[in-house]
């Protein structure tokens, strides 16, 4: 719901209901200045949910009244940033979001695994071992699933080098799932990120079918003339652009067919960035 910045929770839910949406992935950022696009939006105050039973009851009752399910509480920071102060703040708020997800009966949190941009992949995997076990333990205690989106968070020079999210490819997924062997950790699957990384976006659905907890519908358009000029080492936004489903390069028939094949029956949310 980050696309509806400035709207109240009630306005957002009313709009979703009027437009016929069955579910929404609700932004739950803390009150802070946004450092990037779509960050800093909060339609549910996670900390208040945990402290105020009346507020929590209102959130649940309004969703029921609107006839719109909350698919997940969404918070997408970089919990492995090299900035220790920002890292600790992000971890603490993520824990609050997990607790709020339990209290609201949502049972799902969507987020990033994060990445220290001063370290390589192997060093970041070591950092996963250090940072994530207590978070996963809390999720297990709360019976909340954590779905990591496969977005590299690498678009322009502000996310260079390496991007701000480690968990972006099937080989890295395999490594992370070995380190964090938990039924409560899975994937928020977005096919569009694989398009510009030149990765097969269908095959991983079959291999990781038991780890697909949540799904995004977002498209990416590759501008071949630009790619052939600047090459794959350029900033991604120099040769691609996010699109709403149907206006990019994802084959939605194949994608939905694969989701049907694996028996996925969870929520699918349209992510709008264009």
Language model regions located:
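Glycine-rich, proline-tolerant flexible connector loops at the mouths of alpha/beta enzymes
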Residues: 25-59, 119
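A short, structure-level motif marking secondary-structure boundaries and short turns
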Residues: 43-45, 81-83, 119-121, 239-242
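Residue-level recognition of beta-strand->loop/alpha-helix junctions
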Residues: 27-28, 74, 150
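Active-site acidic/histidine proton-transfer and metal-coordination neighborhood
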Residues: 17, 56-69, 78-186, 196, ...
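N-terminal small/glycine-rich loop or linker at the start of catalytic domains
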Residues: 35, 70-81, 115, 231-238
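Histidine-acidic metal/acid-base catalytic patches
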Residues: 1-23, 28-32, 57-58, 64, ...
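A generic secondary-structure micro-motif detector
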Residues: 2, 48-49, 87, 125, ...
């Amino acid at each position: 719901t980050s696309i509806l910045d400035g709207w109240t929770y009630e306005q957002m839910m009313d709009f979703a209901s009027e437009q016929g949406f069955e579910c929404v992935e609700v932004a739950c950022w803390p009150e802070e200045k946004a450092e990037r696009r779509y960050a800093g939006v909060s339609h549910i105050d996670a900390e208040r949910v945990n402290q105020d039973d009346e507020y929590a009851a209102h959130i649940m009752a309004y969703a029921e009244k609107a006839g719109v399910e909350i698919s997940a509480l969404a918070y997408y920071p970089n919990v492995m940033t090299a900035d220790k102060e920002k890292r600790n703040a992000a971890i603490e708020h993520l824990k609050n979001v997990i607790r709020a997800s339990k209290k609201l009966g949502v049972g799902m949190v969507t987020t990033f695994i994060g990445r220290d941009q001063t370290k390589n992949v192997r060093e970041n995997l070591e950092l996963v071992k250090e940072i994530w076990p207590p978070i996963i333990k809390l999720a297990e205690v709360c019976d909340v699933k954590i779905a990591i989106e496969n977005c590299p968070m690498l678009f322009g020079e502000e996310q260079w080098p390496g991007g701000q999210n480690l968990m972006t490819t099937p080989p890295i997924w395999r490594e992370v799932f070995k380190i964090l062997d938990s039924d409560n950790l899975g994937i928020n699957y977005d096919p569009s990120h694989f398009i510009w990384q030149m990765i097969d976006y269908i095959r991983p659905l079959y291999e990781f079918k038991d780890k697909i907890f949540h799904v995004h519908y977002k498209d990416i358009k590759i501008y071949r003339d630009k790619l052939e000029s600047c090459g794959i080492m350029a900033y991604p936004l120099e040769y691609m652009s996010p699109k709403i489903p149907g206006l990019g390069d994802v084959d939605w028939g194949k994608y939905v067919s694969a989701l049907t094949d694996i028996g996925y029956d969870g929520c699918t949310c349209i992510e709008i960035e264009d």
